[in-house]
């Protein structure tokens, strides 16, 4: 597994920063969006952009 830092930008201007271990960048992005949804930041239609960076 690799370590990722994910930044989820919402249409209401909120930036959500999330760190996790995942197999792929796609999986890390999905985990971050789910964590944002659980935190009440917005659903999938509210996401403007998801930026995934692998930490080496």
Regions found by a protein language model. Give the residues of each.
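Short, mixed-charge low-complexity intrinsically disordered segments
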Residues: 37-56
